[in-house]
Regions:
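Long, compositionally biased charged/polar accessory segments in the mid-to-C-terminal portions
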Residues: 263, 272-438
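Long, solvent-exposed, non-transmembrane segments immediately flanking or lying between transmembrane helices
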Residues: 1-317, 321, 334-341, 345-346
Length: 438
């Protein structure tokens, strides 16, 4: 009897662990002959050209603005970093009278910019042909036509190389390593068009999975003019298990349907907007939202504080968004190095050019940036989640416990169970016959 109780106790402990669905993570290093090249998104840190600022504040047609040559606004205001709403408002300071003219100016600009439709936002931003002045991939020339455009509220017009959509099957691949392979870009930042509230001159670079949309606010690096920035990449793949295992991973589909959870970041943003609209009656104007949702007023104290309260509530453990990790994801390790560019010896080809072209050299260093993105290794690092136990191991474990403590195999146990069932059946039939005879 003691052995039977111990075997049942051990079996109970095993089943309890099994129902927690533990996992093991395996690491594999796969040396590839060809490796998929990532998507590369580039954005200017200045989302709108300064020459259009007077026009959008005065509600002047952008076409007339360009023809009539409206002067830009006064440049005497101090520089500010372009930020989202949370970087401009705080219920504990600004709305108690501690706001300053700098933030007020930035808030007014954001209100005006967010009121523009997508067509006008595209007009006042940078075009791909003027922004991307040189492009090559694996030594072959490419152009601005090889980039897809999308709009971002913080960075304006952004451009993506090697972006995949549902009707496309495979991204570009690469078979060589080193800075002589991969993608090479020369970007013209057009610093003369920068707003006085854009305190940093440069470009935002996002390296991401070709099947995923970029998130410039959450990921990416900034590059500066006058430098060649080299980014050496390594690739890591992660495969997770769905429910009931601990990560409860999900699949994000690349669909333009609300809520269009193309990615984990988009899912979180949609969750924030949904809760904001439900509680505050309006959505955060600096995040993507449904066209039917009313946008909050950036200068309204109650609405801004309500949006802050929503973020605090969502940070609590019991109010998390239902946004699981993706079941499969690709990430890239980035090792960044920089060097001055261009050098005087490469820019000038003769003594005469030193006399006639010093201005162009200074302008190039002030406004242009060079970017190299390549793989440092074709080894893919794979992390794969696997179940620690399979269903068949339940029977194996039960049989093992019975064998250790009772000296019985699982087959013998089933035979005993079958005999007991037959005896019970015979006893029931006997009792039924006895009752009928009486």
């Amino acid at each position: 009897m003691g052995g039977l109780m111990v075997s049942f106790y051990q079996a109970f402990r095993f089943i309890n662990v099994y129902l927690q669905y533990p996992i093991v993570v395996t690491l594999q290093m796969d040396q590839k002959q060809f490796l998929d090249f990532p998507a590369v998104t580039v954005c200017n840190l200045n989302r709108i050209k300064e020459k259009y600022l007077r026009c959008i504040h005065s509600n002047v047609s952008l076409d007339l603005c360009y023809v009539q040559g409206f002067l830009p606004v006064d440049n005497t205001k101090p520089n500010l970093i372009m930020s989202e709403r949370t970087g401009l408002h705080s219920c504990t300071s600004e709305f108690r009278g501690n706001s300053d003219a700098e933030k007020d100016f930035t808030i007014q600009f954001l209100k005006t910019y967010l009121a523009l439709n997508s067509k006008n936002r595209k007009k006042v931003g940078y075009g791909s042909k003027e922004f991307i002045t040189l492009c090559s991939f694996n030594g072959k020339l490419c152009s601005a036509k090889d980039f897809t455009e999308f709009q971002n509220l913080r960075y304006g017009n952004c451009f993506t190389f090697n972006q995949l959509y549902q009707n496309e099957s495979k991204p570009l691949t690469i078979s060589q390593t080193g800075d002589q392979s991969g993608l090479v870009l020369v970007l013209d930042l057009l610093d003369l068009y920068y707003l006085n509230i854009s305190s940093t001159i440069g470009a935002r670079i996002i390296i991401h999975d070709p099947k995923e949309e970029p998130s410039p606010e959450e990921t990416g690096i900034n590059i500066a003019p006058g430098y060649e920035t080299s980014v050496a990449l390594t690739q890591t793949a992660v495969t997770r298990l769905p429910a009931p295992y601990r990560d409860h991973c999900g699949e994000y589909k690349n669909e333009n349907i609300w809520p269009y959870h193309k990615s984990l970041n988009r899912c979180v943003r949609n969750c924030i907007q949904y809760n904001s609209f439900e509680v505050c009656g309006c959505a955060d104007p600096t995040l993507p939202s449904m066209t039917s949702q009313k946008l909050c007023n950036l200068t309204d104290k109650s609405e801004m504080c309500c949006l802050d309260d929503i973020l605090l509530l969502l940070l609590e453990e019991n109010r998390t968004c239902d946004c699981p990790l993706p079941c499969s994801s690709i990430s890239y390790g980035e090792k960044v190095s920089v060097a001055r560019w261009p050098s005087a010896s490469s820019f000038f080809t003769g003594e005469a050019e030193y006399t006639y072209y010093p201005f162009q050299f200074r302008k190039s260093r002030k406004s242009q940036a060079k970017l190299k993105i390549f793989y440092s290794s074709l080894t893919q690092k794979n992390y794969v989640q696997r179940p620690m136990f399979h269903e068949s191991e339940i029977y194996s474990h039960l049989g093992g416990e019975l064998g250790i403590w009772l000296g019985m195999s699982l087959m013998v146990t089933f035979e005993i169970f079958e005999i007991v069932c037959m005896l019970v059946k015979i006893l029931i039939n006997f009792l039924l016959r006895c009752s009928s005879n009486e």
